[in-house]
Protein backbone atom coordinates (compact mmCIF):
# COMPACT_ATOMS: atom_id res chain seq x y z
CA UNK A 1 0.00 0.00 0.00
CA UNK A 2 1.22 3.47 -0.76
CA UNK A 3 -0.07 6.79 0.52
CA UNK A 4 -0.63 9.05 -2.47
CA UNK A 5 0.27 12.73 -2.58
CA UNK A 6 -2.17 15.13 -0.98
CA UNK A 7 -4.62 17.21 -2.95
CA UNK A 8 -3.53 20.45 -4.60
CA UNK A 9 -4.09 23.85 -3.07
CA UNK A 10 -6.91 24.59 -5.50
CA UNK A 11 -8.96 21.72 -4.12
CA UNK A 12 -8.15 22.68 -0.55
CA UNK A 13 -9.36 26.23 -1.25
CA UNK A 14 -12.49 24.85 -2.85
CA UNK A 15 -13.15 22.73 0.24
CA UNK A 16 -12.79 25.75 2.54
CA UNK A 17 -15.23 27.74 0.44
CA UNK A 18 -17.77 24.93 0.67
CA UNK A 19 -17.38 24.75 4.45
CA UNK A 20 -17.94 28.51 4.79
CA UNK A 21 -21.20 28.25 2.85
CA UNK A 22 -22.69 25.56 5.11
CA UNK A 23 -26.10 26.62 6.52
CA UNK A 24 -26.03 27.52 10.20
CA UNK A 25 -29.14 25.51 11.07
CA UNK A 26 -27.92 23.32 13.91
CA UNK A 27 -27.30 20.35 11.61
CA UNK A 28 -24.22 18.82 10.04
CA UNK A 29 -23.89 19.19 6.28
CA UNK A 30 -21.54 17.06 4.22
CA UNK A 31 -21.40 15.30 0.88
CA UNK A 32 -21.65 11.84 2.44
CA UNK A 33 -24.29 12.62 5.07
CA UNK A 34 -28.06 12.56 4.61
CA UNK A 35 -30.76 13.10 7.20
CA UNK A 36 -33.40 10.57 8.20
CA UNK A 37 -36.13 12.29 6.19
CA UNK A 38 -34.13 12.05 2.96
CA UNK A 39 -33.33 8.41 3.63
CA UNK A 40 -36.97 7.55 4.31
CA UNK A 41 -37.86 9.05 0.95
CA UNK A 42 -35.48 6.60 -0.72
CA UNK A 43 -36.97 3.44 0.80
CA UNK A 44 -38.26 1.24 -2.01
CA UNK A 45 -36.45 3.14 -4.78
CA UNK A 46 -35.06 0.74 -7.38
CA UNK A 47 -31.79 2.61 -7.70
CA UNK A 48 -31.13 2.80 -3.93
CA UNK A 49 -29.79 0.07 -1.66
CA UNK A 50 -29.79 0.33 2.13
CA UNK A 51 -26.94 -1.45 3.90
CA UNK A 52 -27.16 -2.21 7.62
CA UNK A 53 -23.57 -2.16 8.87
CA UNK A 54 -24.49 -3.84 12.16
CA UNK A 55 -24.74 -7.23 10.47
CA UNK A 56 -27.38 -9.90 10.11
CA UNK A 57 -27.55 -10.81 13.80
CA UNK A 58 -28.50 -7.27 14.79
CA UNK A 59 -30.85 -6.91 11.82
CA UNK A 60 -32.91 -9.79 13.20
CA UNK A 61 -34.19 -7.39 15.85
CA UNK A 62 -35.18 -4.82 13.25
CA UNK A 63 -33.76 -2.95 10.30
CA UNK A 64 -34.93 -0.67 7.49
CA UNK A 65 -37.28 -2.13 4.92
CA UNK A 66 -35.29 -3.65 2.06
CA UNK A 67 -31.88 -3.37 3.74
CA UNK A 68 -29.16 -5.96 3.30
CA UNK A 69 -26.76 -6.51 6.20
CA UNK A 70 -23.02 -6.97 6.47
CA UNK A 71 -20.14 -6.33 8.89
CA UNK A 72 -16.88 -4.49 8.33
CA UNK A 73 -14.83 -7.57 9.17
CA UNK A 74 -16.03 -9.23 5.94
CA UNK A 75 -14.58 -6.31 3.96
CA UNK A 76 -11.14 -6.51 5.58
CA UNK A 77 -8.21 -8.91 5.63
CA UNK A 78 -8.75 -11.29 8.55
CA UNK A 79 -5.80 -13.66 8.24
CA UNK A 80 -4.23 -14.37 11.62
CA UNK A 81 -5.33 -12.25 14.55
CA UNK A 82 -5.78 -8.58 15.34
CA UNK A 83 -2.39 -6.88 15.26
CA UNK A 84 -0.86 -9.24 12.71
CA UNK A 85 0.61 -7.82 9.51
CA UNK A 86 -2.19 -6.73 7.11
CA UNK A 87 -4.97 -7.79 9.52
CA UNK A 88 -7.78 -5.25 9.29
CA UNK A 89 -6.59 -3.70 6.02
CA UNK A 90 -8.95 -3.22 3.06
CA UNK A 91 -9.38 -6.36 0.99
CA UNK A 92 -7.53 -6.56 -2.32
CA UNK A 93 -9.63 -5.35 -5.31
CA UNK A 94 -10.71 -8.77 -6.56
CA UNK A 95 -11.73 -10.04 -3.12
CA UNK A 96 -13.58 -6.84 -2.25
CA UNK A 97 -15.38 -6.86 -5.61
CA UNK A 98 -16.52 -10.42 -4.95
CA UNK A 99 -17.85 -9.47 -1.50
CA UNK A 100 -19.66 -6.36 -2.73
CA UNK A 101 -21.09 -8.27 -5.68
CA UNK A 102 -22.50 -10.94 -3.37
CA UNK A 103 -24.38 -8.18 -1.53
CA UNK A 104 -25.61 -6.47 -4.69
CA UNK A 105 -23.65 -3.31 -3.86
CA UNK A 106 -23.04 -1.94 -7.35
CA UNK A 107 -21.64 1.39 -8.51
CA UNK A 108 -24.79 2.34 -10.41
CA UNK A 109 -26.87 2.40 -7.22
CA UNK A 110 -27.18 4.96 -4.46
CA UNK A 111 -25.81 3.19 -1.39
CA UNK A 112 -27.15 4.38 1.97
CA UNK A 113 -25.37 3.00 5.02
CA UNK A 114 -26.92 2.58 8.46
CA UNK A 115 -25.19 2.28 11.81
CA UNK A 116 -25.52 3.07 15.50
CA UNK A 117 -23.49 6.33 15.39
CA UNK A 118 -22.60 7.44 18.93
CA UNK A 119 -23.63 4.10 20.45
CA UNK A 120 -21.56 2.06 18.00
CA UNK A 121 -18.05 2.05 16.58
CA UNK A 122 -18.68 3.76 13.27
CA UNK A 123 -19.23 0.56 11.30
CA UNK A 124 -21.22 2.48 8.69
CA UNK A 125 -18.37 4.93 8.14
CA UNK A 126 -15.81 2.15 7.77
CA UNK A 127 -17.90 0.65 4.95
CA UNK A 128 -18.38 4.05 3.31
CA UNK A 129 -14.65 4.77 3.60
CA UNK A 130 -13.90 1.47 1.85
CA UNK A 131 -16.48 2.10 -0.88
CA UNK A 132 -14.88 5.46 -1.63
CA UNK A 133 -11.48 3.79 -1.83
CA UNK A 134 -12.98 1.24 -4.23
CA UNK A 135 -14.19 3.95 -6.60
CA UNK A 136 -17.84 4.29 -5.55
CA UNK A 137 -19.23 7.82 -5.68
CA UNK A 138 -22.94 7.68 -4.77
CA UNK A 139 -22.51 6.60 -1.16
CA UNK A 140 -24.03 8.14 1.96
CA UNK A 141 -24.52 7.62 5.69
CA UNK A 142 -27.65 8.49 7.63
CA UNK A 143 -27.06 11.19 10.24
CA UNK A 144 -28.17 9.63 13.50
CA UNK A 145 -28.17 6.18 11.97
CA UNK A 146 -30.89 3.58 12.29
CA UNK A 147 -32.37 5.14 15.43
CA UNK A 148 -32.93 8.46 13.68
CA UNK A 149 -34.78 6.71 10.87
CA UNK A 150 -36.94 4.73 13.27
CA UNK A 151 -37.81 7.85 15.25
CA UNK A 152 -38.76 9.59 12.01
CA UNK A 153 -41.21 6.79 11.20
CA UNK A 154 -39.26 4.68 8.72
CA UNK A 155 -40.74 1.39 7.55
CA UNK A 156 -38.88 -1.47 9.22
CA UNK A 157 -38.67 -5.24 9.02
CA UNK A 158 -37.25 -8.11 11.04
CA UNK A 159 -34.29 -9.85 9.36
CA UNK A 160 -32.20 -8.35 6.60
CA UNK A 161 -33.36 -8.74 3.01
CA UNK A 162 -31.76 -11.37 0.81
CA UNK A 163 -29.11 -9.73 -1.38
CA UNK A 164 -29.46 -9.71 -5.15
CA UNK A 165 -25.94 -10.67 -6.31
CA UNK A 166 -24.46 -8.72 -9.20
CA UNK A 167 -21.20 -8.38 -11.08
CA UNK A 168 -18.82 -5.84 -9.54
CA UNK A 169 -15.42 -4.79 -10.87
CA UNK A 170 -12.85 -2.86 -8.86
CA UNK A 171 -9.77 -1.86 -10.83
CA UNK A 172 -7.76 -0.62 -7.86
CA UNK A 173 -7.97 0.64 -4.30
CA UNK A 174 -7.37 4.38 -3.89
CA UNK A 175 -5.14 4.87 -0.84
CA UNK A 176 -5.41 8.67 -0.80
CA UNK A 177 -6.96 8.68 2.69
CA UNK A 178 -5.38 5.46 3.99
CA UNK A 179 -2.44 5.55 6.39
CA UNK A 180 -0.10 2.56 6.63
CA UNK A 181 2.07 1.49 9.54
CA UNK A 182 5.17 1.74 7.35
CA UNK A 183 4.46 5.33 6.28
CA UNK A 184 3.60 6.43 9.80
CA UNK A 185 6.77 4.91 11.24
CA UNK A 186 8.90 6.46 8.51
CA UNK A 187 7.50 10.01 8.64
CA UNK A 188 5.84 10.18 12.06
CA UNK A 189 6.78 13.81 12.75
CA UNK A 190 5.12 14.96 9.51
CA UNK A 191 1.67 14.16 10.90
CA UNK A 192 -0.63 15.29 13.67
CA UNK A 193 -2.02 12.16 15.28
CA UNK A 194 -5.59 12.01 16.61
CA UNK A 195 -6.63 9.25 19.01
CA UNK A 196 -10.42 8.88 18.87
CA UNK A 197 -10.79 6.20 21.56
CA UNK A 198 -12.31 6.54 25.02
CA UNK A 199 -10.59 8.18 27.98
CA UNK A 200 -9.83 4.78 29.52
CA UNK A 201 -8.24 3.48 26.31
CA UNK A 202 -6.20 6.65 25.81
CA UNK A 203 -4.94 6.46 29.39
CA UNK A 204 -3.77 2.85 29.16
CA UNK A 205 -6.69 0.46 29.66
CA UNK A 206 -6.43 -2.75 27.63
CA UNK A 207 -9.98 -3.62 26.60
CA UNK A 208 -9.67 -5.43 23.27
CA UNK A 209 -6.59 -7.66 23.58
CA UNK A 210 -4.19 -4.92 22.53
CA UNK A 211 -0.51 -5.85 22.88
CA UNK A 212 -0.02 -2.86 25.19
CA UNK A 213 -1.91 0.06 26.67
CA UNK A 214 -1.56 3.80 26.19
CA UNK A 215 -1.54 5.88 23.04
CA UNK A 216 0.71 6.91 20.17
CA UNK A 217 3.38 9.45 21.20
CA UNK A 218 2.03 13.00 21.25
CA UNK A 219 -1.43 11.96 20.08
CA UNK A 220 -4.18 14.55 20.36
CA UNK A 221 -7.24 13.10 22.09
CA UNK A 222 -10.57 13.81 20.38
CA UNK A 223 -13.08 11.12 21.29
CA UNK A 224 -15.20 9.53 18.58
CA UNK A 225 -18.24 10.29 20.72
CA UNK A 226 -17.28 13.99 20.75
CA UNK A 227 -18.52 14.18 17.16
CA UNK A 228 -22.13 13.65 18.17
CA UNK A 229 -25.00 15.48 19.82
CA UNK A 230 -27.11 13.81 22.51
CA UNK A 231 -29.57 12.44 19.94
CA UNK A 232 -26.81 10.64 18.05
CA UNK A 233 -26.68 13.06 15.12
CA UNK A 234 -23.48 14.89 14.24
CA UNK A 235 -22.74 18.27 15.77
CA UNK A 236 -23.00 21.22 13.35
CA UNK A 237 -20.00 21.88 11.09
CA UNK A 238 -19.08 25.15 12.79
CA UNK A 239 -19.00 23.51 16.22
CA UNK A 240 -16.87 20.61 14.97
CA UNK A 241 -14.38 22.87 13.20
CA UNK A 242 -14.03 24.89 16.39
CA UNK A 243 -13.46 21.69 18.39
CA UNK A 244 -10.79 20.50 15.94
CA UNK A 245 -9.01 23.85 15.92
CA UNK A 246 -9.10 24.19 19.71
CA UNK A 247 -7.54 20.72 19.92
CA UNK A 248 -4.63 22.00 17.84
CA UNK A 249 -5.57 20.97 14.31
CA UNK A 250 -5.27 23.21 11.27
CA UNK A 251 -6.71 22.68 7.79
CA UNK A 252 -3.13 22.80 6.50
CA UNK A 253 -2.05 19.87 8.70
CA UNK A 254 -1.56 16.29 7.59
CA UNK A 255 -3.80 14.47 10.10
CA UNK A 256 -3.90 10.77 10.97
CA UNK A 257 -6.88 9.43 12.91
CA UNK A 258 -6.63 6.09 14.69
CA UNK A 259 -8.59 3.96 17.14
CA UNK A 260 -8.30 0.24 17.91
CA UNK A 261 -8.92 -1.15 14.43
CA UNK A 262 -9.64 1.74 12.08
CA UNK A 263 -13.42 1.79 12.57
CA UNK A 264 -14.18 4.75 14.83
CA UNK A 265 -11.28 6.59 13.22
CA UNK A 266 -12.83 6.17 9.76
CA UNK A 267 -15.76 8.30 10.95
CA UNK A 268 -13.34 10.90 12.28
CA UNK A 269 -11.42 11.00 8.99
CA UNK A 270 -14.56 11.43 6.90
CA UNK A 271 -15.91 14.18 9.15
CA UNK A 272 -12.54 15.94 9.12
CA UNK A 273 -12.53 15.82 5.33
CA UNK A 274 -16.11 17.11 5.09
CA UNK A 275 -15.14 19.98 7.42
CA UNK A 276 -12.30 21.04 5.14
CA UNK A 277 -9.41 19.14 6.73
CA UNK A 278 -8.69 17.57 3.36
CA UNK A 279 -5.24 16.18 4.15
CA UNK A 280 -6.55 13.55 6.57
CA UNK A 281 -6.03 9.82 6.81
CA UNK A 282 -7.54 6.80 8.53
CA UNK A 283 -4.96 4.40 9.97
CA UNK A 284 -6.90 1.20 9.32
CA UNK A 285 -4.62 -1.13 11.32
CA UNK A 286 -4.54 1.37 14.20
CA UNK A 287 -3.55 0.50 17.76
CA UNK A 288 -3.89 -3.25 17.34
CA UNK A 289 -0.97 -3.19 14.89
CA UNK A 290 1.02 -0.28 16.33
Where are the model-predicted features located?
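Flexible, polar/low-complexity N-terminal or interdomain linker segments that lie immediately upstream
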Residues: 3-61, 146-210
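Thiolate-centered catalytic microenvironments shared by cysteine-dependent enzyme domains
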Residues: 23-25, 90-183, 264-281, 285-286
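Extracellular/periplasmic catalytic domains that process cell-envelope and extracellular macromolecules
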Residues: 42-45, 60-64, 104-107, 124, ...
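N-terminal carbohydrate-binding/catalytic regions of secreted carbohydrate-active enzymes
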Residues: 48-102
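Helix-loop module immediately N-terminal to the HCX5R catalytic loop
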Residues: 79-107, 224-255
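A mid-sequence, solvent-exposed acidic-amphipathic segment
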Residues: 193-216, 220-233
Amino acid sequence: QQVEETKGSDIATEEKEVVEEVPDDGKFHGKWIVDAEYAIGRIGAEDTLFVDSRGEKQAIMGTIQGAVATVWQDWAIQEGKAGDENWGCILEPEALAEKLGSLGITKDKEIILLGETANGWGDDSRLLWELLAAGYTDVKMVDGGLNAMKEAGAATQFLASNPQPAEVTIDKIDYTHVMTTEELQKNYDDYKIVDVRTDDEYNGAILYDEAQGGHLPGAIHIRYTDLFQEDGTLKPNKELVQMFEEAGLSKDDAIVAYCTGGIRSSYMQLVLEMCGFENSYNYDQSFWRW
